[in-house]
């Protein structure tokens, strides 16, 4: 049985989550679909990467993770499959993968091109890619390999003087705890 995780900025009030799950189950009726979160702030790939980073390694190897945050397919932004740390990440080439780890590099990145010219939503493309992988398909058949993904580099910590450090709040949890850039390596900050 396949395990597919979903993480999005859809929210929980509309029908997008049901649509995504319906599409997945239509392709892979025995899939185990796990919701990581659908409450990511709209278009916030930094928050999405933080949540993904804290959760993905707890899943079995070869789990397929669909991250639909800021994932509009356009000429400027490709949809990709990244084989990273023995997991598959299906998302947009928007800097998300670069935020998962500085130490671990992706084994392979594929720009999804099997549906060029298809104006379907990104979730339809993600589902087709996930189904291909789950059925044992080689990710090379989904498109073309890309060597360099977009990198997100705006989270640098800056020291202005001996007593001032500037950083960024990455995530605010349900208890009001703030995670900021200098905490990023600390797993249990609150």
Predicted regions and their residues:
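Anionic-ligand-binding alpha/beta catalytic cores of soluble enzymes and soluble regulatory domains
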Residues: 117-179
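Short, acidic Gly/Pro/Ser/Thr-rich loop/turn segments
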Residues: 11-13, 74, 97, 174-177
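N-terminal glycine-/serine-/threonine-rich phosphate-binding loop
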Residues: 1-75
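Single conserved hydrophobic/aromatic residue that forms the stacking wall/gate
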Residues: 180, 184-190
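A generic local secondary-structure boundary/capping motif
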Residues: 54-56, 78-80, 100, 155-159, ...
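Alpha-helical architecture
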Residues: 7, 68, 91, 171, ...
